[in-house]
């Protein structure tokens, strides 16, 4: 074999090895830009193991990681959006819906379930940002209301994970109506003494932040989540000024009293269980039975 044949042979072998690596095995952190093994990132619940950056996570993956195994029962799973206004921008609304449904496997942006968390009954809603930016339309509003009413019926807490760009413009006034609708059912929950915990994730903006997302009895945020009404770019263009560093991020909002606490995704399950046990006047799931017995003997 001549020297030129050997070079071509090496190149061919190298290219063939590269092509054998399946797509999607590796990904890059959107913050530190470290190359990460996809399965490892999934094990860390989409949190970068190098820098701790919280990336966006699929709503169903979040629910499975949070709730007790085999306890999840979906609420209002049959609701599906309709193009009542025959809305069209660059595309028809019905085409956008079809594309989002095909991409995510969901009928709309909100998933609502009843389940248990460390054995405690709970109702949970989670917005999926991958479905049209987690935007709130009539189905999202209706599913949220049904979840809240289920929580009232069971007299158990409602927890909502928000990840949304706001109201869905393709539904116009129908989407704006959901702001009042969701706020009204939360007022009803308050009257009945049923707690609501709102968890704000990246991003929570627009009509969602201006309605149910900021109405929790306790408002929690994930680290460095973007939270506000308009995004920072829009604000800067409007006021023609540079915003402070970290403006509208979780840490800024906590410092200024707009939220109650910041909780890492890996600690969310235990934190929620502790909070809910206190709100519902139930024993903490992390107190050992022997300790409870010792306390009762002392009394």
UniProtKB/Swiss-Prot annotation:
A zinc finger (C4-type) spans 29-51. It catalyses: N(6)-carboxybiotinyl-L-lysyl-[protein] + acetyl-CoA = N(6)-biotinyl-L-lysyl-[protein] + malonyl-CoA. GO terms for cellular component: acetate CoA-transferase complex. InterPro entries: AcCoA_carboxyl_beta, Acetyl_CoA_COase_Trfase_b_su, ClpP/crotonase-like_dom_sf, COA_CT_N, Znf-ACC. Pathway: Lipid metabolism; malonyl-CoA biosynthesis; malonyl-CoA from acetyl-CoA: step 1/1. It is an enzyme of class 2 (transferase). Keywords: ATP-binding, Cytoplasm, Fatty acid biosynthesis, Fatty acid metabolism, Lipid biosynthesis, Lipid metabolism, Metal-binding, Nucleotide-binding, Transferase, Zinc, Zinc-finger. Zn(2+) binds at residues 29, 32, 48, 51. GO terms for biological process: fatty acid biosynthetic process; malonyl-CoA biosynthetic process. One of its GO terms (molecular function) is acetyl-CoA carboxylase activity. Belongs to the AccD/PCCB family. Component of the acetyl coenzyme A carboxylase (ACC) complex. Biotin carboxylase (BC) catalyzes the carboxylation of biotin on its carrier protein (BCCP) and then the CO(2) group is transferred by the transcarboxylase to acetyl-CoA to form malonyl-CoA. This is Acetyl-coenzyme A carboxylase carboxyl transferase subunit beta. The gene is accD.
